[in-house]
Design a protein with these regions (language model features):
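Basic, polyanion-binding surface patches
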Residues: 1-173
Length: 173
């Protein structure tokens, strides 16, 4: 029998192999970029994506007030911008200005997306619910855009305090 070591449940959750990293944008006038690893596809039909945000974060209130948001998948070349947006509060700094990332107007929502990201999803907020120490904001994807020749190997993931890219493909389904 394989020997297993018991661990604290929170530490156990952090052993999940990887979480995608996204830059979420919320708001038109008072906008902010937040780095998130709690992101999940909740449904394919209709297409629903959710992000989990702690109530103590500045973006939490902005997400509550806004009818929409964008989810943006950054490539590995944006790792410094991703870290900056995760370490600074939007209360204190305009993250678009400080990072040099470019807001692009939404096609179907008021909130901008990030031009430099590999993939942009425009989402209309359809549901909000609290789970433990996070609030989940669920959005229906109303527009999706990707760079031509999108290579998912460039997308950032987060695991055990490290930003990574995808690894070896073992086998197709």
């Amino acid at each position: 029998m394989t020997v297993k070591i018991e661990m604290n449940p929170v530490r156990g959750i952090r052993t999940f192999p990887a979480f995608p990293v996204v830059l979420a944008v919320v708001g038109k006038e008072e906008r902010n970029i937040i780095t998130l690893a709690l992101v999940h596809v909740f449904s394919f039909n209709p297409p629903l994506i959710g992000v989990g945000i702690m109530p103590s974060r500045h973006s939490h209130e902005l997400f509550h007030r806004s009818p929409d948001f964008s989810i943006n998948i950054p490539g590995k070349e944006l790792v410094e911008e991703v870290i900056f947006c995760g370490e600074r509060s939007g209360k204190d700094v305009d993250k678009f200005e400080k990072t040099g990332m470019t807001p692009i107007p939404g096609k179907k929502i008021e909130t901008p997306s990030i031009d430099e990201c590999l993939v942009n999803f425009e989402c209309r907020k359809v549901q909000t619910f609290d789970t433990g120490d996070h609030t989940w904001f669920i959005g229906e994807v109303v527009t999706a855009r990707t760079v031509e020749g999108y290579d998912r190997e460039r997308a950032l993931i987060y695991w055990a305090g490290e930003f990574r890219t995808l690894g070896e493909i073992i086998r197709g389904r």
